[in-house]
Structure formats: C-alpha cells, structure tokens
C-alpha cells in the first residue's frame, strides 16, 4: 500500500504551521514533519485589533509550495484555526472591511444587551454555547451598529478557516465544528438560528448551510499543475485536538492546552439543562455527530504575555525556577475578563493580587507560579463541575496540545484534580486535522480507529496525583466563590 501524504495548515493566535503527515496504512505508521512555521499577531488598523490575513495567506501558500518543491505528491490539504472570527466578501469574492480579532473591544456591553432583549436562557436553549463577549453573535451586532455601510457591500461571511479554503479553491464552505463556536447555530437543527441572526442584523443570506467534517471543498492547483483536494476538516482547532485525544473510554476527560485551555468530555447528546447554563458550559460541535461538552479557560495566554513582557526566552529555565517556589502564595481568577487583553499582563496580575489582599508577585518566576497554581486550581474546579453535570466521575484527564509539554503544570493539574493525567500528543490539532483527511481518503473508518493510530504513534506521559503536595492540600481551601465565569 502506498504512503499517503497529507498537509495540515494549523493556525493559532500566535503562530501558524504547515505540517506534512506521512501515513503507511499497513503498519499504521504516522509521522509528522514541520515544513513551514510563521508568526501570527494582531495589528492595529483604523483603531481595531485585526488579523493580517494577507500575510497569513502568503505564508500558507509558501508552506504548500515548499512541500511541492520537495517532489512530494500531496494527497489532500486541511486547514484548522481558532474560532468565532470571520471575513466578509462581496459578490465578486473580494474582501469587505477588516478581519477584526475577537480580542478587539468593539463588543463591549453587547452580551448584556442580547440577554436583556432575547433572554439568557433562550439564547442558551437555542445555541447551547457558552456566553463569551467575543462570540460571533456579538461581533456581527457590533459590525452592524458600528460599520453599517459594510452590510450592503457584503454578500458572504466566512469563518477564518473557511476563508483560507476559499482562497485556495474559490469555493465557499461553512464547516460545522467552527460554525458552532459563533453562538449562531441552532443546537437542534445544526443550521443557522434565524432568531439569533436576526438580532445581529446580519443577513441570513451571508451564510450557507454548515457542513460536517469530511467533505472536499475544492482543489488547490499546485505550481506543478496537480489538483490537490482541500478537505473540510474539523476546522476549529479544538475540535481537531479532541479528535486526536487518545481517550481511554467514555469516562476520560480532555484538556486542550494552549493559548486557551479547553476542558471537557465527549457526548452523543448536548447538555443544555439549567445546571449547564449556570456553569456556563458550552456544547460545541465535533466529528461524527459528537458534542464537545466543555468549558473555556483563559489558559496559557497569560503566560505568553508575561514571557513577552519580561523578555523571557528560556521557558524551561523559567519553569525550573518556578518549581522551586512555594505553591499557592499568589492566586488569581484566570477567567476574569480583566485578563483578556490588558495593556500589561504582568501589571494586571499584580493588581489582581493586590486587590485580593494577597502578596504581589514581582519576579518572572513568581508571576509564572501565580499563573500555574491558579490554572491548576481552576482546572480542578471545572473538572468537578463537569463530573457533577454528567453524574459520574472521570477516570483520567488527557492533556493535549502545546501546553502538555509543561511538566510542572501537568503535575500541578494531577495533584489539584486528584486524577491521573496523561499528557500528549503535543501536535493534537495538527493530528486531528490529518485524521479527518485520512478518513476522507478512506484510509481510516472513524475517529475511534484514528485514536488507535494516535496511541500507537504518539509519545504519552503519565502523571500520578500526589495527595500530599502543597496544591493538593490547598484545594480543600479553594473557594469557588473566589472565581467568576469567564466573561459571563
């Protein structure tokens, strides 16, 4: 059997990669190779925080061309990115307006406005999605209110991965897993909810019916003239990461750890009860009709900002210095919206500790210790919420994504949660992207079969909880009322 070559374009909030996967069907050997890496950052344009999508497109094309230059025949391409953000196109397929980021503050106050007009429970009943102030629901309302001239110019609204697929193929697509992050998809019909869309003021005609992962959107013509299928993978990066999570059984939870931390479990049915609403649980779409019942946690965004502000280049050295410090001296609520995009993350963390009457972290190691301890405690709280929601404790927690390389945080998580943690794979989003491509190419039957491939090829590390650790002893004192729901 011939080797399959699939390319995953994986875009994150701070960087992007073009990765080549080679799959040998016989031994089920799967290898990944990074072909091209590039930075991604926000730019101020006309007062808005925007993505440089032209630069990103150029980097994507350069990465694909690098693969072709090596004489490799690509079987398929897939693109995954972050959620909620969109690009407007006119009837000719030209971009309209700016590709504004979810971290821009233009949606301030609109979540409360929606709750007042539609009702919080009604919005949740329709969408099943967590209330976040930057959801596309509120972004579109901000667009209509603040830039009404763009509404008549636009003919289509594409989420970020669908936009880049369009740029490669010329074909429009609205992929389901990412569409659900908008808070605009009806959880019962898997189509756009007209009541919610009407509230935004955006035309329903901007959107086509969401399609589930696994369809071929179109073809990219490589410089050598080959027509390469572009597959609609699970284009929300977390959806792809969950596909690649080697969950042991239905009682295993996952934590996709990166800029954001997404903690949850898979379910064949959504959870939209009052308890789920009160806990601000989200029911995002997954592959094969599964729901990703999860909660957004601010994640390593706080650390990324601190590293930049403190000019730290040696992360492993910082982690070693952090591990030597006592635990739980500085505790913040990582899900406080004050940490979404402050002018200085270091100063904001210090201010939060000062406001709480705690000692104030001064050094880079103390700031990191504050972040790690606070995240681990929040992970424990969320895991308990999820277990209570489903009425059954979890057997394991699988940490996947780039954050799973942080061994200190992995152990703190195991200790705080009192559960065995299995870390890996690191490249979860990329692997999940590749998994859907291999299923589309009929090399694998389903997600469960792909997870067997992941288990057979990925390096996994187990962390056993230590009930005598400082953070484990502190957990009993950790008061839930000290935290509030992220942007709820």
UniProtKB/Swiss-Prot annotation:
Keywords: ATP-binding, Disulfide bond, Kinase, Nucleotide-binding, Rhamnose metabolism, Transferase. Its EC number is 2.7.1.5. One of its GO terms (biological process) is glycerol metabolic process. GO terms for molecular function: ATP binding; glycerol kinase activity; rhamnulokinase activity. Pathway: Carbohydrate degradation; L-rhamnose degradation; glycerone phosphate from L-rhamnose: step 2/3. Disulfide bonds join 68-222, 353-370, 413-417. Involved in the catabolism of L-rhamnose (6-deoxy-L-mannose). Catalyzes the transfer of the gamma-phosphate group from ATP to the 1-hydroxyl group of L-rhamnulose to yield L-rhamnulose 1-phosphate. This is Rhamnulokinase.
